[in-house]
Amino acid sequence: MRGLLIWFLIWVCGPAWSAHAYAQFGDIRYPAGFAHFDYVNPAAPKGGEISLVPPTRLSNFDKYNPFTLKGSAPPGLTGLVFETLLTGTFDEPTTAYGLLAEDVTVAPDRLSAVFRLNPSARFTNGDPVLAADVKHSFDRLTSKEAAPQYRTIFGEVQGVAVLGERSVRFDFKRVNAELPLIAGSLPVFSRKWGLVNGPAGQILKPLDQIVTDTPIGSGPYRIGKVNFGRDISYERDPGYWAKDLNVRRGLFNFDRITYKIYKDNTAQLEAFKAGEFDYIQAFIAREWARAYTGKPFDNGQLIKKELKHGNAGDFQGFQFNLRREKFKDARVREAIGLAMDFEWLNRQLFYNAYTRVRGYFVASDFEARGKPGADELALLEPLRGQLPPEVFTADVPLPPVTSLDPASGITLRDNLRRARGLLAEAGWTYRDGALRNAKGEPFTIEFLDNSGSMGRVVTPFAKNLEKLGIAVNTKVIDFAILQKRMDVFDFEVISSRTVGSEAPGTELLERFGSRAADTEGSSNLMGIRNPAVDALLDKVISAQTRPELVARVRALDRVLRFGHYVVPHWYGGVHRVAWRAGRFEQPAVTPRYYQPESWITSVWWATQANRDGLRRNAGDSSVGAK
């Protein structure tokens, strides 16, 4: 779910909670009064700096407000400047601990949760964080002034009531074990953010008109030096209210965190080798094998490592826009998928570094397998009239495999033959030099890309599609333009990646729900409008135990895979990262569930040489204060 780093699970059934934390399923790992998380160094020195590039490349940013649809906010802003009522950990996926809220109480009927705010909590302007700020944040984020995904995320919250100066109650529309976590993930900002002088006194701007107003959050960092479109620095707040709190002890150790923006992957890597920044994550196997080489790596100036993790695999694939008529037929989508030769790509381009994505819940317990068992059938049977018969009788679809053995029956030629048959069934036949429908219209596909790196994959894919008579056009556009087109669903086929989750829940409404298909800025890029999917989503978010959640998500995965909404890509089992030697240290314990960027910026710390260098550069400034 969004807004919380909620990772590992203790395997028992049913919701549990206590004053200092809430667990959706199972036990709470850290008891009341715990000293610090196991994976941090509580004595880590403060100081020094780290500079990096965002894992999702931005070509520009033009605002300081991450909560609205229009424009692009800088990387790092949400997690460094704003805070939530509860905070997750890197070693539990469905448990969160008090941050802005010092305790949480869930009602016996589980239809509400009361959060009592920490009296020490302060915004960066010195004001206390009060219940009125929490309600204000909720009301603004669920209004039409905010990006529409927040209305989906908090859609099961009936409302927020102020009970006292530092006490606030979230009322829920129904029993849902995840809802206290969702309420706890609310980003809280000051009621004074966006306050300006007007003719008759101070007025508050609508949230979508707060653009470059300095954020008033409660997080450990403030915005420092900014070059719009190039880089942004965050400076550690020496007076940060939670620096001695157990959920923050040993965290956020750098005095300065700088994100740099480059036009493409090549420019990023060359700048890294030249010493312009400290840390980078690689997502392209070919670049990792061939470009992360040379003198700086050979002489130890730069370190490259493949870091193990226990995360669920990320979902990635070419997503069809079902809002376009030509992609509405599942047989057409399946036929296009048959033209992608993953085995060739893995041999020739990926150095055999990847495994094929099979479903939407990659390398996890939630991935459907084989034929449905009794638990899934109990969920699917009431939907029989809305589902293809093979959902009940056939193995769940797997991506096509391409063999080099002519006798295998699954060579590329065989797969393309099957594709032609599916296209013909759907009314598309080859004539006059192209694949055409009954009206004589040719079948064309436009792939959008923002970096050009996907071109090496699309090119052989396009050659295979051309054998079917499909004309392919690949268009490389700026990230900001791509983001705008994605927000309004102005594309045909696009490559998209979603970070895997150890506890899928309400965020799936954003990815697959019918309502989100018509909501600009939603994650339902495919435009899925399927009543059976909606019914299963409803079951998923109402799961009360871990076994219930597993069965319900598997049933959802099965139905989605029979829809052939994507051409699945691939995933790797490690994080590929590189950094400058001699600048950083890290704890001996590595958490099992983490994303490298957030782990490194929050848990690592600077070496003495790094800290001394920043102090020399800062002179007598407050940067580096303890």
Describe these PLM feature segments:
Residues G71, L77-E92, S185-L251, D255-R256, ...:
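Gly/Pro-rich hinge or "lid" segments in bacterial periplasmic/extracellular proteins
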Residues R116, R151-A200, P220-N227, P372-Q386, ...:
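Surface-exposed binding/hinge segments that line
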Residues V160-V162, G224-E235, K260-R324, R331-A335, ...:
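Extracellular/periplasmic solute-recognition and catalytic clefts
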